[in-house]
Amino acid sequence: VDLLHGAFLIHDDVIDRDDIRRGSPTIHADVRDRLALRGGDPAEAAHDGVSMAIIAGDLALVGVQQILLASDLTDHQVRRALGILGNAATVTLGGELRDVINGAIPADADRIRESSWMKTSVYTFEAPWRLWAMIAGRDEEPMVPVGRDLGRAYQAADDLAGAFGATADTGKTAGGDVKRGRSTLVTMRDGAEADVIAEVIA
């Protein structure tokens, strides 16, 4: 799950053009800056940085499968785990696509909430809890609504931190969504969302 999470973050940093993650340079930014110091073409350095980040994210995705196949889980559990994680990856990628589209086309609150669920809830909360329940021989379904709500709350809090937090505190590029014109519950100009933001802050 950590490898899957890492893969998504690496690719997300490329898509969002974020140079900082957890207080350190992102992979594409680190490679770009190291190559630029050698006096090469800045555009080529930037391209190579993106290429390296894509490859690193892809390797992490492959690593998820390799770890499961080498685990002590039964064949049935491995197949089920691959299904859970595969579904999580598919939904998350769909959410990432929607997030990109939301930056080009104004989105309403419902669409933003749906994107947040797809982009964050499934792989961060729902999939891990499904895995734990499956391995323990328990029912997976009761974990889903809780994971969905926690994921949406986490994404809303992350949007707030990204919009108003300082890089030194959040470890991320400050104001990224605002600068890119990305539609989030925070950046929406619809006053009807004020109560939603107030709930998140509380």
Where are the language model's segments positioned?
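All-alpha prenyltransferase/terpene-synthase fold signal
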Residues: 1-202
